[in-house]
Regions:
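N-terminal alpha-helical transmembrane segments of multi-pass membrane transport
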Residues: 1-81, 91-98, 399, 429-457, ...
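Extracellular loop-to-transmembrane helix junctions
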Residues: 17-50, 92-130, 307-315, 351, ...
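Transmembrane helix-loop junctions in multi-pass membrane proteins
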Residues: 25, 40-44, 82-87, 162-174, ...
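Membrane-interface loop-to-helix entry segments
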Residues: 28-35, 39-52, 171-177, 183-233, ...
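Flexible loop linkers connecting adjacent transmembrane helices
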Residues: 42-67, 89-91, 95-99, 111-144, ...
Length: 485
């Protein structure tokens, strides 16, 4: 009886997962990306350079969590084994053309990420310890007046990012170390739990500081390997680019045909960069923005989508396509295909490098995923006791994931994430006018040559702003003087 029940549950989860990621989410997220791109006047292209400038400026030390730390934390969650294994699967299923559609969806997703992160900053709150918190649950409650909607989103995110994804990330780490070095999975799991506990028990600030250290190292190391493969095969690059375009548009036979390439590439891009999911918006709200305007964090997260997909996913694609592993059947897919490609190009030592990369990618994802979930736990309840219990449960799931096979958990997490995205897209479409006006205010100040500063008194139509956070310093001083007199 129990086995039949589990089979039915697994069948239902797989069906829902296929429906969400196979059709519904693709159309919804693409439509949202097109809408926001048009309404913002292709801002991801017009002001791309300005976004890069803000990421660099965000490294300045401030009292709180800097924009650069938030950028690194969101990248820690975005960049994982999916940027390696997922790209390999996309190419296997859809052919080289999948890469073209992956690029396209990322460019559209940059606008969606801009909108949701700007809204997260607008409706953020300050907790009892002076830490900024926000995200979709908060703008659903404060912007739409729908706490029930925020509650649903929070529960879905906690299931996906707090528990399931962290279990799978731990499982990937232990597999990598066990396969490369023969290490015992239980011992590895205990080490991962202790390292995770040290960081997540320090709260969002410690997570942000750890991400600031780990993410640049893992990104530079992986990009350096990809660049090495690119340089040693530079003569093949024009042909590879031509194949990507021809396969995408159906001018040349692809593994899955033009439609297969489109679906595989779009799905991979959406899943990788998380634009529209509402996940990165949770940490975006935690930034002490520089300059002091909500739209600045929109620019930062827009660049995050670009780096995740256009830079890192493309690096994986380059390694696979230039190595020659696609020229003949080899029975490999996913991370195995990437490993074979690296072995062909760089030799057996690349197995150790890939294990190292997986460790950094997965561990950084664990702590970043936790930070997303923590903000949503605090949305549901302000109880420190509940937060303490939640941290214990997260660490327990990390340990379980280290030693167990979790395919059903992974599929359930995908369903939670898909439903989470649908709820978030509905909210940001309903709040899009607020985002447009805030972003327009930023652009007007930028064009006039001043550092954009957000003055909440200029936006009487925006309700439920946290008192004092978004009134500029001059305005606050004027108010205080008036009250004194």
């Amino acid at each position: 009886m129990f086995e039949k029940l589990m089979m039915w549950i697994e069948s239902a989860i797989n069906y829902t997962n296929g429906l969400l990621w196979g059709s519904v989410l693709i159309y919804v997220l693409v439509a949202a990306g097109v809408l926001f791109t048009l309404r913002l006047g292709f801002i991801q292209f017009r002001l791309f350079g300005h976004g890069v400038k803000l990421v660099i400026q965000g490294r300045e030390k401030i009292d709180g969590i800097s924009s650069f730390q938030v950028f690194c934390t969101s990248m820690a969650a975005r960049v994982g084994t999916g940027n390696m294994a997922g790209v390999a699967v996309a190419i296997t299923v859809g052919g080289a053309g999948a890469i073209f559609w992956m690029w396209l969806i990322a460019m559209l997703g940059m606008a969606t990420a801009f909108i949701e992160s700007t809204l997260a900053q607008v409706y953020k709150v300050k907790d009892s310890e002076g830490q900024y918190r926000g995200g979709p649950a908060y703008y659903m409650e404060r912007g739409l007046g729908k706490r029930w909607m925020g509650t649903i989103f929070s529960i879905l995110l906690i299931i996906a990012f707090g528990f399931a994804f962290n279990s799978v990330q731990a499982n990937t780490m232990t597999d990598a170390l066990n396969n490369a070095f023969g290490f015992d999975k239980t011992i590895i799991g205990l080490v991962i739990v202790l390292a995770s506990a040290y960081i997540i028990c320090g709260g969002l600030k410690k997570v942000a500081k750890a991400s600031e250290l780990i993410v640049p190292v893992m990104a530079v190391a992986y990009l350096a390997i990809a660049l090495l493969v690119l340089v040693t095969n530079i003569e093949q690059v024009p042909a590879a680019l031509s194949l990507i375009v021809k396969s995408a548009l159906g001018w040349e036979e692809a593994a899955g045909g033009a439609m297969g390439a489109m679906m595989a590439g779009i799905a991979r891009g959406l899943f990788s960069n998380e634009a529209g999911m509402g996940s990165a918006a949770n940490i975006a709200a935690s930034a002490t923005p520089n300059p002091n305007h909500p739209a600045s964090q929109g620019f930062v997260q827009m660049i995050g989508v670009f780096v995740d997909t256009i830079v890192i996913c493309s690096s994986s694609a380059a390694i696979i396509m230039l190595s020659g592993v696609l020229d003949a059947p080899n029975g490999q897919e996913g991370i195995g295909l990437l490993q074979l490609a690296l072995n062909n190009e760089l030799g057996a030592w690349s197995s150790y490098f890939l294990a190292f990369a997986i460790i950094l990618f997965c561990f950084s994802s664990i702590i970043a995923n936790y930070s997303y979930a923590e903000s949503n736990v605090m949305f549901l309840t302000k109880s420190k006791k509940v937060l303490f219990i939640f941290r214990g449960l997260v660490l327990a799931m990390v340990m379980v994931g280290s030693v167990a096979s979790l395919s059903l958990v992974w599929n359930f997490a995908d369903v939670s994430m898909g439903l989470m995205a649908l709820v978030n897209i509905a909210a940001i479409v309903m709040l899009s006018k607020v985002a447009y006006s805030v972003i327009k205010d930023y652009e007007l100040q930028l064009k006039s040559g001043v550092t954009p500063t957000f003055d909440s008194t200029k936006f009487p139509e925006i309700d439920n702003l946290e008192g004092g956070i978004w009134v500029n310093k001059n305005q606050k001083t004027a108010k205080s003087s008036a009250e004194t007199n």
